[in-house]
Amino acid sequence: MAALASVPDTLAPGSPAKVGILDLAFAVRGGRTELVERYQKTPLQIMRPLWIDPEQPGMSYVYIMATGAGVAQADRYRMDFRCGPDTQVHLTTQAATKIFRMEHDYASQRVHLSAEAGSYVEYLPDPLIPFKGSRFYQRTEVTVAPGATVVVADTLTAGRLARGERHAYRVLATDLHISRPDGTLLAIDTLRLVPGRRGGGVLGPAVFAGHDLVASLFAVTDRVPATVLADALHDALAGLGLLHGVSVLPRDCGAWVRVLDDSPIRIAGAQEAVRQAVRRLLTGRPAPDLRKP
């Protein structure tokens, strides 16, 4: 990605509206999770927190939004989420993230999420859609304290599928890094997708495997044994007819699942099935319908 860095003929990195920042902190106040610190810089912003879960009325639901139509060249986004002890937080996006065509430089997004003991945090953004010629890097760093639960997911598409556009982006690179506060590594998931370049294949069995969408979900928790969580994930997908794989994470810290398919609707259904399975297993309660189209 560094090789693509350049000064575009439009607004350069660091220009107004090119650096989006979200810095949010949550704490328990009056029996429910409240947003106690907030800093936001356009184009990133949030809706005010919602408390819409009748089963867990203290959980704060936060929708992340961007004032532009999508991510453009030379955009630099950074999001920091700090979830205090015993907080309950659900973080999601308003819609899919569109990565526009780029002629110069690249765009990046960095996410830092920390969860303290007793917290239950979900970070479940909508799919990432890379347009033809786009160049994008995303790094997600998650710090999970012992006694905390974090569920983090992502969905990558091959492009604008309705237009017949598949793997026409220039570069799509993502890193997920999950660790303990003392630095103990729990999981790493790295993707480097460079269509057309030798060694940068995108259709192999370890990537898209000939499909149009790939979705992943990692659940880190010590509320139940990792094998029990993995079995719940597998059972949630067993009857859906989608290609998927489930495995436990190291040190008995949780489990993860990856799903491949060609239908955005089926992928969304699979993500919802595993979200419900994790929520029911770990809390004994279902998750609410978020009413996204």
Curated annotation (Swiss-Prot):
Entry GO MF terms: nickel cation binding
InterPro entries documented for this protein: UreD
Main location per the UniProt record: cytoplasm
Superkingdom as given in the UniProt entry: Bacteria
The keyword Chaperone appears for this protein: yes
GO cellular component terms, semicolon-separated: cytoplasm
Protein's cellular compartments: Cytoplasm
Alphabetized UniProt keyword annotations: Chaperone, Cytoplasm, Nickel insertion
Pfam family, one: UreD
Annotated function: Required for maturation of urease via the functional incorporation of the urease nickel metallocenter.
Family: Belongs to the UreD family.
Subunit text: UreD, UreF and UreG form a complex that acts as a GTP-hydrolysis-dependent molecular chaperone, activating the urease apoprotein by helping to assemble the nickel containing metallocenter of UreC. The UreE protein probably delivers the nickel.
The protein's name: Urease accessory protein UreD 2
Source species of the chain: Streptomyces griseus subsp. griseus (strain JCM 4626 / CBS 651.72 / NBRC 13350 / KCC S-0626 / ISP 5235)
